[in-house]
Regions:
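Active-site glycine/GP-rich loop and adjacent strand/helix microenvironment
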Residues: 91-317
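Gly/Ser/Thr-rich beta-alpha loop segments that engage phosphate groups in nucleotides
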Residues: 36-39, 78, 176
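Short, solvent-exposed polar/charged micro-motifs at secondary-structure junctions
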Residues: 2-3, 80-82, 180-183
Length: 317
């Protein structure tokens, strides 16, 4: 594999349609988080999507959660106008990560406490923000297991979340590109590779990964800039272990109602002609959006960004 050339994010962005091995109607489009300022659209076939779910099923079962048990999802599935949604088929309570503010603290507490979940998932910053609000209100929850992903889980976040939720956190690391998947060790001493998911080459300035599960959009020797701190392998433990993951610290947008909006890649969903972007906030009621446009950038792209912002943040917020 190392004899093949490295594929960069810019290369994928320019040649995504040429990389597809099947018609677009047979794949699902996904957008990366754009933590480097350059969001990317990639494609996944249904087989790879089901395989990722199978990996999640096995991993979570190992940590003490079985699919079908009561589960709370505190991620970006719901917008600003929808606080909660229960899906009875999967026994999942979805809560909006865009409405975590002092005014809604009691609602989140009551909803989770009444539901009595076995596990909860969420962005580290979302769970941490809720934990702070619960602490300020003198409230605590009882949730045996918590799963975090999409951002770097910082030590102070882990401590506060585990304290207020009376839980044990297991962190997961993956990419929308489906090129790598790591699970935290049961004893919390580093991260292990998901067997058969990808071939990974760890460098000082990132990693190069080859996906083994997405045949419809093959990512071969794809370069990521997320830096891994490695643990030394020994005869007793020859398996590759990642000690710490850098590069996933997420910024957030402060709203007037006190909520914090994270993973701001949603701003560029459906926007096709932006090379790079930067968001700058100096006051709670002001957001400056800078873009490096492609030649075909037009008003429809600008209006789409404005629509996406209002949809997630809310009018006047």
């Amino acid at each position: 594999v190392k004899k093949l050339p490295v594929v960069t994010k810019d290369m994928v962005k320019q040649h995504a349609n040429e990389m597809l091995t099947v018609p677009k109607r047979k794949v699902r489009k996904g957008n990366t988080s754009g933590t480097t300022g350059t969001p990317l659209s990639v494609y996944s076939d249904w087989k790879s999507i089901w395989m990722v779910q199978a990996y999640l099923y096995c991993t979570r079962k190992r940590y003490g959660f079985t699919y079908g048990q009561r589960f709370v999802s505190l991620r970006g599935h719901l917008d600003k106008n929808n606080l909660s949604l229960k899906i009875h088929l999967s026994n999942t309570l979805f809560l909006s990560s865009y409405n975590i503010n002092p005014a809604n603290t009691q609602f989140y507490y009551d909803s989770i406490r009444k539901f009595k979940p076995r596990a909860i998932e969420g962005y580290p910053s979302s769970l941490y923000t809720l934990a702070l609000l619960l602490s300020d209100a003198g409230l605590k929850l009882e949730i045996p297991v918590a799963f975090t992903s999409s951002e770097t889980l910082l030590p102070y976040q882990r401590e506060k979340i585990e304290q207020q939720f009376n839980t044990q956190i297991f962190d997961l690391y993956g990419m929308t590109e489906r090129t790598i998947s790591l699970m935290e060790a049961y004893n919390h001493q580093g991260y292990y590779e998901m067997p058969g998911f990808s071939i990974n080459e760890y460098l000082e300035d990132g990693e190069i990964c080859t996906s083994l599960i997405n045949e419809s959009f093959p990512m071969i020797r794809y370069k990521s800039n997320d830096v891994m701190e490695m643990m030394e392998t020994t005869e007793d433990n020859p398996q590759i272990v990642v000690k710490h993951i850098e590069g996933r610290k997420a910024d957030y947008l402060c709203c007037k109602d006190g909520s914090h909006i994270i993973l701001l890649d949603f701003l560029f969903k459906g926007v096709k002609h932006v090379k790079m972007s930067q968001l700058v906030q100096t006051k709670d009621d002001t957001l400056e959006i800078y873009v490096v446009p492609e030649p075909d950038f037009e008003d429809v792209d600008k209006h789409q960004i404005e629509y996406n912002l209002m949809d997630r943040v809310g009018t006047g917020n």
